[in-house]
Amino acid sequence: MKIRIGHGFDVHKFGADRPLILCGIEVPYETGLIAHSDGDVVLHAISDAILGAMALGDIGKHFPDTDAAYEGADSRVLLRHCFKLAREHGFAIGNLDVTIIAQAPKMLPHIEAMRAVLADDLQTELNNINVKATTTEKLGFTGRKEGIAVEAVVLMENVK
């Protein structure tokens, strides 16, 4: 098969006494996200999308939250591992589209830095990476500022 599509979704709750890390960068906010790893909800959704495109399960299978080895893990390392698996199967990023769903903090000032990190980690051109943010107009848990949700869709192209 020449192309594959993967979809990833993740949610994390606010409340951790640590920095808010999204796409590997620190985003100023009053609290971080609760998680076994560093809580980078964006990279978790992208990792799941890549694994899904390759029919390799999900990040819970590869990096279980019951394994102390992944406690506080840098999600960029996890993402790079997932991408390496895709490369081993002969695939590269065609394009990636990410939607961050959060009432706060505002994402716009950080979007270009996020795109640059992703392009670097996924060894692709910046114009293959899109990151956007939206709110739920104060509805639901994201609207009440209880957490952040992320959806990611990736098109993987066979390059062998």
UniProtKB/Swiss-Prot annotation:
Site (Transition state stabilizer): H36, T135
Record-annotated membrane-spanning stretches: none
E.C. number(s) listed in UniProt: 4.6.1.12
Cofactor(s) named in the record: a divalent metal cation
Binding of a divalent metal cation, residues: D10, H12, H44
Residues at which 4-CDP-2-C-methyl-D-erythritol 2-phosphate binds: 10-12, 36-37, 58-60, 63-67, 102-108, 134-137, 141, 144
Domain of life: Bacteria
Cofactor binding: number and manner: Binds 1 divalent metal cation per subunit.
PANTHER family: 2-C-METHYL-D-ERYTHRITOL 2,4-CYCLODIPHOSPHATE SYNTHASE, CHLOROPLASTIC
Membership in a protein family: Belongs to the IspF family.
Protein name according to UniProt: 2-C-methyl-D-erythritol 2,4-cyclodiphosphate synthase
Organism per entry: Shewanella amazonensis (strain ATCC BAA-1098 / SB2B)
